């Protein structure tokens, strides 16, 4: 149907009523709260949930509704993100000059650049091919992604970095939501 970026924009515009997505709504509509999706900030899902359900999470959700015209219906835990490569990675210094495949998430790119890696934004459908052809030396993702993409066929090492508590958001366009009957709104929230 469209990329994550396009679907997020369409949901903000009311062209799509609901979406299941990653951190794009925060990145676009509440960038000051993007730390919720930044590497090495949250130690586990319980920690994430405590902060998300607290005052900072409330402010982040309010900003997404105000600026992005979307309401968070829920959060889905997608696992901890790990790294794959063809060389062992024991310390952050070993990612120096490594071409690391990343999604087009500004915060993630900035963090990995700060660690000395050379981020290569590659769409997820091209992940396997990019590693096989050497366009990227390494990748990062949750274990389900690593397994389902069969990255063991093109990468010899898996490093359990747990560098990001990966969550996904389920959001509804606020204009669409407000037009629903109160009982239907209650079913959604």
What are these regions (language model features)?
Residues 1-48, 55-189:
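N-terminal secretory/targeting leader peptides
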């Amino acid at each position: 149907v469209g990329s994550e970026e396009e679907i997020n924009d369409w949901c903000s515009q009311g062209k799509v009523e609901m979406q299941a997505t990653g951190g794009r709504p925060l990145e676009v509509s509440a960038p000051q709260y993007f730390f919720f999706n930044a590497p090495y900030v949250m130690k586990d899902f319980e920690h994430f949930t405590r902060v998300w359900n607290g005052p900072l999470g409330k402010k982040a959700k309010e900003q997404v509704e105000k600026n992005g015209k979307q309401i968070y219906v829920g959060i889905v835990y997608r696992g901890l993100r790990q790294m794959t490569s063809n060389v062992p990675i024991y310390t952050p210094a070993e990612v120096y000059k490594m071409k690391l495949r990343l999604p087009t998430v500004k915060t993630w790119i900035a963090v990995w650049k700060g660690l000395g890696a050379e981020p290569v934004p590659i769409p997820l459908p091209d992940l396997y091919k990019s590693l096989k052809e050497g366009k990227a030396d390494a990748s990062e993702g949750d274990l389900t992604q690593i397994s389902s993409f069969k990255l063991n066929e093109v990468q010899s090492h898996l490093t359990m970095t747990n560098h990001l508590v990966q969550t996904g958001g389920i959001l509804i366009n606020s204009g669409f939501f407000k037009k629903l009957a109160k009982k239907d709104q209650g079913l959604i929230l």
